[in-house]
Design a protein with these regions (language model features):
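C-terminal cap/substrate-recognition subdomain and adjoining C-terminal extension
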Residues: 7, 12-16, 51-72, 99, ...
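Non-catalytic pre-domain segments flanking phosphatase-related domains
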Residues: 21-22, 35-111, 119, 123-126, ...
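Electropositive phosphate-/nucleotide-binding environments in soluble metabolic enzymes
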Residues: 80, 179, 295
Length: 386
């Protein structure tokens, strides 16, 4: 009997120990799960805060930020679809879940008609060509240059630039400056753009930047974007116009190019010539090197940037190639925006072209930007179209 009691007590204690062990196991598992959850939560929170503090400089488009030193991002923009889509895009790529490293944040802008005036009454480099031929008393133009300048004048009057004129201006442009070194050429451009715009009051040629687009560039820079210009115009001319007006380094400006040679180089190839620091300077050679139109804009991006842009901004058919290229980014989603010059009250516009661009945007998935509907100003409130 004593043996049975002993065994019974032993079995009871054994079962009790098993119950206690099972209960403790459950408690340990629950505590461990809670600890793991807390650790993961804190880790993810710290990761998000790290992005926010150290990398993500996303700025609310409608709120004044101290980062801007009382500058309001996109203050010349109305509430519009383009602004909303850009804001949402920036918020998305600076979010921890869809984060794009700042070294991959690249935006490419066309120049004439996208951030700078192109219709008063024609592209700046065409006006420069015309001025050099007909208004520069120190220069003796060739008969061919006179003929091309006359075509430029005709284009100014009708508001259309033919493919033939583009070809003729592009191929003969360097001949205008054959006696200029690069410093003389840049000074000539600066003197030219320091004069008033013909069709506007209170606006110099060199100040004819679209204020909303300059705000947009600054906004992107605050969000760690690298800004590039890709223009069909001659590269040094674009660099010179931008210098002092928009904070974009010369190395980030892509354009059409002409051969540049040393003053005493003659017909000797560059790889066979030795530069003379005492007598040489550099100037255009009378030969065409590379245009930066259409697909060549993509090639220029590949050659000089070496990465796929996230954003492209253009205004014309010549920008369609790089617009489609940015939307074909395999690593990150890309957006293409097109400026539609549809405000004849504040700017000189071709309404038919603007409406066609809006249709092209619908067909291709580009985002239209309307000067008339999306911008509160173009050049500033004090600038008035004549």
């Amino acid at each position: 009997m004593d043996t049975q009691k002993l065994l019974s007590n032993y079995n009871f204690k054994r079962k009790d120990k098993l119950r206690l062990f099972f209960l403790l196991s459950i408690i340990i598992i629950l505590v461990a799960s809670i600890i793991c959850f807390i650790v993961l939560y804190v880790k993810e929170k710290n990761k998000t805060e790290s992005y926010s503090k150290n990398e993500n400089k996303y700025i609310n488009l409608d709120v004044e930020s101290s980062n801007y030193k009382s500058y309001i991002p996109l203050s010349s923009w109305k509430k519009c679809d383009a602004k909303t889509k850009l804001s949402d895009y920036i918020a998305n790529i600076t979010n921890a879940d869809n984060y794009v490293p700042k070294e991959d944040r690249i935006a490419v802008f066309d120049f004439d008609g996208t951030i700078f005036q192109e219709n008063d009454p024609i592209y700046n480099d065409y006006k420069l060509y015309y001025y050099r031929v007909y208004n520069d008393s120190k220069y003796t133009p060739t008969e061919e240059q006179k003929k091309i300048a006359a075509e430029i004048k005709k284009s100014m009057e009708i508001g259309e630039v033919s493919d033939e004129l583009i070809k003729n201006v592009t191929t003969t442009y360097p001949e205008l400056w054959k006696d200029f070194n690069m410093e003389d050429y840049e000074k000539y451009i600066k003197d030219f753009i320091d004069k008033p715009c013909e069709g506007f009051e209170n606006l110099k040629r060199g100040d004819a930047f679209y204020r909303p687009m300059i705000e947009l560039i600054e906004y992107l820079k605050k969000n760690d974007f690298q800004i590039y210009i890709s223009s069909g115009a001659e590269r040094v001319q674009v660099r010179t116009v931008i210098d002092g007006h928009v904070d974009i380094p010369p190395s980030n400006i892509i354009g059409s190019e002409y051969d540049i040679i040393a003053k005493n180089q003659g017909s000797v190839k560059g790889h066979e010539y030795t530069y003379d620091k005492n007598t040489d300077d550099f100037r255009f050679n009378n030969s065409f090197y590379r245009s930066n139109f259409r697909t060549n804009k993509i090639i220029g991006i590949i050659r000089e940037i070496g990465k796929h842009p996230l954003l492209v901004f253009g205004n014309a058919h010549g920008d369609s190639d790089m617009a489609n290229y940015v939307m074909n980014n395999k690593n990150y989603p890309g957006l293409a925006f097109m400026i539609c010059c549809d405000d004849n009250t504040r700017e000189k516009c071709n309404i038919q072209k603007a409406e066609q661009m809006k249709e092209d945007c619908k067909k291709n998935g580009w985002i239209p930007i309307s000067m008339k509907d999306d911008w509160t100003t173009i050049y500033g409130e004090n600038v008035i179209k004549k």
